[in-house]
A protein has these predicted regions:
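Short S/T/G/P-rich N-terminal loop/turn motif that feeds into the first structured element of a domain
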Residues: 1-53, 61-68, 92-95
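C-terminal structural segments of small proteins and small subunits
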Residues: 60-91
Length: 95
């Protein structure tokens, strides 16, 4: 199993409806991406967030599934509108 973690800082001026859309669309990836076993995403509640407002964890069956996720059309469609709005960080590891 491979764990994909991410956190976002929103760029200035991003409206709440876009933030909510991001959460909904990330959750909606489940069932569309082969090998994506579980998706958890939510608004950060930690006082130690260093400005990261949204975080998530995705569990993939293996590295091949994680690699395929990166180029999957559904993921790419999400990234097309989301990337200009965020400052992201990602960490992936085998579990």
């Amino acid at each position: 199993m491979v764990i994909h973690t991410f956190a976002f800082r929103w760029k200035a001026g991003v409206p709440e409806n876009q933030k909510s859309r991001a959460v909904a669309e990330i959750r909606g990836l489940q069932g569309h991406i082969p090998g994506l076993l579980e998706t958890l995403v939510g608004v950060n509640i930690s006082p130690r967030s260093q400005g990261y407002e949204l975080g998530g964890v995705m569990k993939f069956s293996d590295r091949t599934a994680l690699d395929a996720y990166g180029g999957h059309p559904v993921h790419q469609k999400l990234l097309q509108w989301l990337m200009p709005l965020i400052d992201p960080i990602e960490v992936d590891f085998e579990a």
